């Protein structure tokens, strides 16, 4: 099951931008846990976004 949590730091309409719009200007990190879960995180001044992908 995929889950996404978006915290918009400025305005709600800013959250409509896609992750591709932020990838080039933010810290884009991918980590994999020992249980197979993968975390994608984007963090910049406008948005903080975390996506967790769990292998089923």
Where do the PLM segments sit?
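Structured alpha/beta or helical-core interaction and ligand-binding surfaces enriched in interleaved
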Residues: 1-37
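Short, compact, well-ordered microdomains
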Residues: 34-56
């Amino acid at each position: 099951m995929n889950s996404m949590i978006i915290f918009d730091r400025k305005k709600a309409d800013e959250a409509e931008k896609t992750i591709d719009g932020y990838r080039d200007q933010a810290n884009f990190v991918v980590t994999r846990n020992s249980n197979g879960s993968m975390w994608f995180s984007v963090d910049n001044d406008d948005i903080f976004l975390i996506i967790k992908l769990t292998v089923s």
